[in-house]
């Protein structure tokens, strides 16, 4: 059996550009793409923390080291400059890979979209 699992996440990135008339996509700083194991043209889901919008597009390379998160084409209507977003990608993983310890790549950024940390799991949520 295959399970559709979280593969990659860039958590709380800041939208730096909205380019309505650019060919549709989301340009992401190459450093972030590599850290999160997202490749060019891979489908990504974007969840806007500020307004609750959730949409899908595909990733393209943004200038390395720029901190760029550019929503392009119709995606530009889903956020404003400065909005916080979560960018996620998923993969089909078989049971054997899961049993062998398969883990996602989770990347955490600061307010300039510089990497401040990473890990391979989401902590258990508690009521404290």
UniProtKB/Swiss-Prot annotation:
It is found in: Cytoplasm. GO terms for cellular component: cytosol. It holds the Pfam family Asp_decarbox. GO terms for biological process: alanine biosynthetic process; pantothenate biosynthetic process. Its cofactor is pyruvate. It comes from Paraburkholderia phymatum (strain DSM 17167 / CIP 108236 / LMG 21445 / STM815). It is an enzyme of class 4 (lyase). PANTHER family: ASPARTATE 1-DECARBOXYLASE. Keywords: Autocatalytic cleavage, Cytoplasm, Decarboxylase, Lyase, Pantothenate biosynthesis, Pyruvate, Schiff base, Zymogen. It comes from the Bacteria. The keyword Transmembrane does not apply. Catalyzes the pyruvoyl-dependent decarboxylation of aspartate to produce beta-alanine. InterPro entries: Asp_de-COase-like_dom_sf, Asp_decarbox. It catalyses: L-aspartate + H(+) = beta-alanine + CO2. This is Aspartate 1-decarboxylase. Substrate binds at residues 57, 73-75. CDD domains: Asp_decarbox.
């Amino acid at each position: 059996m295959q399970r559709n699992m979280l593969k990659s996440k860039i958590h709380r990135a800041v939208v730096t550009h909205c380019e309505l008339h650019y060919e549709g996509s989301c340009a992401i700083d190459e450093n972030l793409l590599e850290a999160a194991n997202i490749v060019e043209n891979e489908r990504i889901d974007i969840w806007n923390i500020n307004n609750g919008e959730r949409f899908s597009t595909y990733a393209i390379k943004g200038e390395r080291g720029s901190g760029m998160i550019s929503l392009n084409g119709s995606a530009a209507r889903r956020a404003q400059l400065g909005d916080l977003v979560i960018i996620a990608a998923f993969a089909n993983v078989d049971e054997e890979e899961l049993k062998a310890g398969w883990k996602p790549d989770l990347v955490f950024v600061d307010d300039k979209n510089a990497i401040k940390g990473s890990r391979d799991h989401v902590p258990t949520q508690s009521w404290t």
